[in-house]
């Protein structure tokens, strides 16, 4: 009797080991797919037209195409989910190395004013429009914040605050990416007739466009003077992601009517955002050489691109059509309003 029992125990152990090995392989496969997509997206983003879209946008689109054309193995989903959540947060922390708080301070209070005004205005207008078009609440918030602050990075940073699903996050990021690309092309065509100096045009681009890649591409016709100030204005908007994320979390929790008692640990504070600020402070103090900081930013974008790929791999095109059409229209109208406001503020604040 002892032999069969031992054989049964051995069989169970072997079966457990096989299952664990299969899970580890599936996890590694999921991570590998997102890494491959992120690398391909990086090189595609260096091509003449695709550089307008940027690595993050291309990664999420490739992910969606991959799912539609090839599919994602069931065991690999754990890896793609890990990339879209855990690696995302680590990437956002490292992205803080892109931000130099000293440069923002040198730009003066008017830059802070224009950033604060456009963010506040855009969140209210775009979210209001999504309600008019009967867009799902969480997707409406993500669309509003992505338009107002910093595109896909804002969408994925705000998503945990409103408990958004992966498909809502992916659709929100894709909408903002497409809108930003459209408006980048429009800005480039309109630059000669806007009547703005290179400096003023840079402020206008940085204050109103969605992604950093969009801002750099749109400001390029104005030369280095336009690009430099455009990036500073844009990064000022990025810096406001922290307070906006906290406020959105508090508002969403209250609007959902949660009456449970919460400790300070339960406050809707995206703790990884403080890592982002800490990295910004390190960069601002000049502790890390610029060359090293540049490499860290490249790694940050690679990690976030892997997260974008993971999101894309979790959403189908039919889901995008179902959830995204009305949100896209709301974002489009809101982006037009944002552009008009930005243009007016450039003149009103004397940035011409």
Swiss-Prot record:
Name the record gives this protein: UPF0324 membrane protein BCE_5279
Alphabetic keyword roster: Cell membrane, Membrane, Transmembrane, Transmembrane helix
Superkingdom as given in the UniProt entry: Bacteria
Family as reported in the entry's similarity comment: Belongs to the UPF0324 family.
Cytoplasm listed as a keyword: no
Regions that span the bilayer: 25-47, 52-71, 111-130, 140-162, 169-191, 201-223, 230-252, 267-289, 291-313, 328-350
Membrane topology: Multi-pass membrane protein
Subcellular location: Cell membrane
Main location class: membrane
Gene Ontology cellular component annotations, sorted alphabetically: plasma membrane
């Amino acid at each position: 009797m002892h032999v069969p029992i031992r054989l049964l125990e051995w069989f169970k152990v072997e079966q457990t080991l096989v299952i664990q090995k299969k899970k580890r392989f599936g996890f590694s496969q999921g991570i590998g797919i997102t890494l491959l997509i992120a690398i391909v997206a990086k090189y595609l983003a260096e091509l003449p037209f695709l550089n307008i879209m940027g690595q993050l946008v291309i990664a999420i689109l490739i992910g969606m195409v991959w799912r539609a054309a090839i599919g994602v193995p069931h065991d690999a989903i754990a890896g793609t989910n890990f990339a879209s959540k855990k690696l995302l947060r680590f990437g956002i922390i490292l992205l803080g190395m892109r931000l130099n708080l000293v440069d923002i301070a040198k730009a003066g209070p008017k830059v802070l004013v224009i950033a604060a005004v456009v963010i506040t205005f855009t969140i209210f207008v775009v979210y209001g429009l999504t309600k008019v078009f009967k867009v799902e609440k969480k997707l409406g918030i993500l669309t509003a914040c992505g338009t107002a602050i910093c595109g896909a990075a804002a969408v994925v940073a705000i998503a945990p605050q409103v408990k958004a699903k992966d498909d809502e996050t992916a659709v929100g990021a894709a909408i903002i990416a497409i809108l930003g690309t459209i408006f980048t092309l429009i800005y480039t065509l309109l630059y000669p007739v806007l009547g703005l100096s290179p400096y003023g045009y840079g402020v206008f681009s940085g204050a109103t466009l969605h992604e950093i890649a969009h801002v750099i591409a749109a400001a390029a016709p104005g030369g280095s003077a336009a690009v430099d100030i455009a990036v500073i204005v844009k990064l000022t908007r990025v810096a406001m992601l922290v307070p906006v994320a906290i406020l959105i979390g508090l508002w969403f929790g209250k609007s959902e009517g949660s009456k449970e008692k919460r400790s300070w640990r339960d406050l809707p504070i995206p703790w990884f955002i403080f890592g982002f600020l800490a990295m910004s402070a390190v960069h601002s103090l000049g502790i890390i050489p610029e060359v090293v900081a540049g490499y860290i930013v490249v790694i940050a974008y690679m990690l976030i691109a892997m997260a974008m790929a993971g999101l894309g791999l979790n959403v189908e095109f039919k889901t995008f059509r179902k959830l995204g059409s009305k949100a896209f229209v709301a974002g489009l109208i809101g982006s037009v309003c944002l552009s008009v406001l930005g243009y007016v503020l450039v003149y009103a604040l004397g940035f011409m």
